[in-house]
Amino acid sequence: MSTTDDPTTANPVGLDRAGYDPSFLTVDVPLPALHTLARELPYVHFTVLLDPVRRLAALTAVNIDGSALLDLGRGDDWHLDERVPDGEQTGPEVYASNDLDRGHLVRRRDPVWGEPVVAAAANVDTFSFTNAAPQAAEFNQSRELWLGLEDQVLQYASTHRQRLTVFTAPVLLDDDAPYRGIRLPRRFFKIAAWTTSDGGSLRTAAYLLDQSPELDGVDLEAAFARAHEQGDPPPLGPYRTYQVPVRDVAEMTGFDLAQLAEADTLRPVPTIEPPDGIREGWVPLTSVDQLSF
């Protein structure tokens, strides 16, 4: 893993890092309010609300301009944010010598638009550790589906030359398992927001990625004990992906998402009784063909 804390690389001098723009769409979409203390960190075309206690992002918000996207090389220079004390962000030590991935929250390509120098800076900014969260490295069908969702968001913006705003974050719960000084989130959410073709109405769609272990009782306790003895990350389960009501994301996270919930395109579907672990109204996704805006 290559990391750098060189400010000339991670934070080019003179560049305006205005962060997320609430007026980016034709309908104003303010940064959702959270009822806990969080550091607001502006980057190029996106903002991270960092929970200094959990040392992870409580929320990320990115503006995507589909008419101005640039295709730049990936790079891999993960770096700490020099504006934040090291003890308030999750650095490389959490990802060393294990099977955890540094999962981008704001996807690398999403803020990479505009003038080349600006797009290049946005590309670098996405490799801040404040924009990462630990995820199970196992690549299965549902994780591929989640990445397919991210691809579709960007493809939609590019094809239709559309502007989108996307909110992404881990769901930070008190009972998340401890590991190397942090707690590993089990769920992640993504909310896409856009306006109708006439520009007059807001529309949203929310998705949830769940990597909770599919164990319980004695089996789960034994798995935790083995991981602790061996110094491994706590057990995580296979990824499951759902489209969910925005109001459920608000309930899980504590964010005020009233405006986004009002614009939710997901309509309730009557069910007899949802399976264990799935709330009523959640739609399990098994194919990219099910993803739509």
Give the label of every model feature segment.
Residues M1-F293:
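Domain-level detector for secreted/extracellular nuclease and nuclease-toxin modules, and
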